[in-house]
Amino acid sequence: MAERGQILVEGFSDQKVVQAILNEHERDLAFDVIYRKGHEGYPSLRESFETTLTKNLDIRGLGVVADADHDVAGRWRSLADVLRGAGYPGVPDTPDPAGLVLESHSSSMAELPRVGVWLMPDNQSAGMLESFITRMVPAGDVLWDLAERSVDECYDIDPRYPAAGSREAHCPKALIHTWLAWQTEPGKPLWQALLKPSLEPGVDHASFRAWLGRLWTVGSAQGT
C-alpha cells in the first residue's frame, strides 16, 4: 500500500492551515497538501480533482477541502458529480456532517483511491476556511465583539464590501483578519494563528482532524 496521500485545496492559506492541523495530529498522516499556484479557487480545484482521479495514482487516499461559500448544496452537487463520473458507487445526495470518505474502487475507467470530501466550515453551513477559524475565537472575547460591530458598520457605509446576498459567506474573512490585526502580535496569518493560545479548537476542528484520520485509515469509510 502507498505510504503517502494527497489533499487538494483551493489556495495558499488553505494549504497552510490544513498542513498545520496535520502536523498537530496524534498520528503520522503523510499527506501532501496541494493547490495550483496561479490558479487558486474552486474551479481550478474541481478540475484538479477530476484530473487526478483519472491518473491511476498509487496514493493512500485523496482528499478535497473546498469552501462551501454561499451555496452548500450546489457545491456538494458539483463535487458529487465528479465522484459519480469517475465511477464511485454510493455517493450520497447530501454532504456527510462528519465529512465524506469512500473506499478505493475499481471502475471501468481507473483504479480509484480512497477519497474524501470536506466542505468548509462544517459540511453543513455556508462559509469558507475563515469561517472554520472564527469558530475557534473564545466566547465573550471583547475584541471579537468590537470586530463584529466594526465590520457591520463597514457593510453599511461602503459599497466596496459584499452585497447583502453574499455577506453570510464572506463576512468571516473580514472578521477574522480584523480580529487578528488587534492581537499582541498583529496580522499573523491564519495558519500561524492556529498555534496561538488565543484560539480554542472546538467541535469543527476535532471533526476535521477525525476526518483526516478516517481518510488515512483503511476500512474507515461509510458503510465499512
Residue ranges and their predicted role:
Residues 13, 40, 124:
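Short alpha-helical
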Residues 38-45:
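Conserved helicase/translocase motor-coupling segment
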Residues 14-18:
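Short N-terminal binding/cap micro-motifs at the start of the first secondary-structure element
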Residues 34-36:
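RNA-recognition motif
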